């Protein structure tokens, strides 16, 4: 926790600066509804604090993956996670947020634990949905495995027939 946060719990400069540095190092950022909320929120806070805005990050958005490939009653992260068995989000009520924003340490700790669980659920959802994403980057490039799965990098491939284009026939895995 930064000293400025201990003095003023509404000062998010340290968190925003840290998040910006982490995002700038990443090739891709995995989010849920990130293009429509998280990235814009972070950009707004960076400008507010007089920090440089992020270069436009490449997002792998599980909300978009779900919305474009599944037909669910809701595309909220909790709904998708429950549907595919990817863990549970912790509940977070308005009163807890309000207490946390006023500096109530137990509420702040609860929000931190909630966010950590959120990341674990997001990771599990992403790992399941990325197989459905036709625009997912080829992870073989990152793993250096030219004969691996382009979506997860696994070398344990199972042939699933062939796919034809106008010019070529490709084996499906």
Task: Spell out what each predicted region is.
Residues 2-79, 83:
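Conserved DEDDh/DEDDy metal-dependent 3′-5′ exonuclease domain
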Residues 42, 100, 168-169:
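Short Asp/Glu-rich motifs
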Residues 61, 96, 164:
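Positions that flank functional sites
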